[in-house]
């Protein structure tokens, strides 16, 4: 496959730890619902269908996910507004199968048991388009090595983005890591519609989906 004309010419498979950009969007009205720590015994859910949602933004990807029996969603997000929105949703509906973690996923991933997740969703992550900010992109060999240990054998990782440079660079990283060429998917699978996707569609941007196993 020929590189897309907007794809960066040079892509690095970073092996160092990604740099976490600590920029929480905190508002006073959310101050009572954020930064709470809920300690749960994750091992008792090992036999469930566990979904890891990384960077759920304002929460649409979690709130709009179709509920099925024996399914548990674990959402990781750094921004307080999205965390507060999902916590309000959980508390209002008295939902018990959604767990929220605020902070850096590169650190939080260490807290999960090995062989735990069936699915990983990474929908419309921050592309960090400026070259000097590429070190903040978390899909690197460093993170993939960690993530792989947390996945069950028949796992599925789903990445979606409308940012051409980001998705082609990510595809390059994955091709190197997996030592094979993965292709873009022609279908969205069970990906819920989010605010970011609606925004991309309004701009008539192409949405790319990468679906693979680690």
Regions found by a protein language model. Name each.
Residues 154-161:
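Conserved beta-strand signature within the Rossmann-like core of class I S-adenosyl-L-methionine
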Residues 111-119:
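A short acidic, Gly/Pro-enriched loop at the edge of an enzyme's catalytic core
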Residues 119-137:
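A short SAM/SAH-binding and catalytic strip from SAM-dependent methyltransferases
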């Amino acid at each position: 496959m020929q590189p897309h004309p907007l794809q960066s010419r040079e892509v690095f498979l970073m092996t160092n730890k990604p740099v976490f950009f600590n920029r929480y969007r905190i508002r006073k009205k959310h101050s009572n619902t954020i930064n709470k720590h809920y300690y749960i015994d994750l091992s008792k859910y090992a036999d469930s269908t566990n979904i890891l949602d990384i960077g759920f933004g304002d929460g649409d990807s979690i709130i709009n996910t179709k509920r099925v029996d024996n399914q548990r969603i674990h959402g990781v997000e750094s921004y307080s507004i999205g965390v507060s929105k999902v916590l309000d949703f959980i508390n209002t509906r008295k939902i018990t199968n959604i767990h929220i973690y605020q902070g850096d996923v590169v650190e939080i991933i260490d807290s999960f048991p090995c062989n735990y997740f069936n699915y990983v969703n990474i929908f419309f992550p921050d592309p960090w388009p400026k070259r000097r900010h590429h070190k903040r992109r978390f899909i690197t060999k460093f993170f993939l090595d960690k993530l792989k240990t947390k996945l069950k054998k028949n796992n599925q990782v789903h990445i979606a983005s409308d940012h051409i440079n980001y998705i082609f660079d990510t595809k390059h990283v994955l091709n190197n890591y997996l030592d094979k060429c993965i292709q873009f998917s022609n279908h969205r699978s069970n990906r819920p519609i989010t605010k970011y996707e609606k925004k991309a569609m309004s701009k008539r941007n192409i949405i790319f989906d990468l679906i693979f196993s680690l």
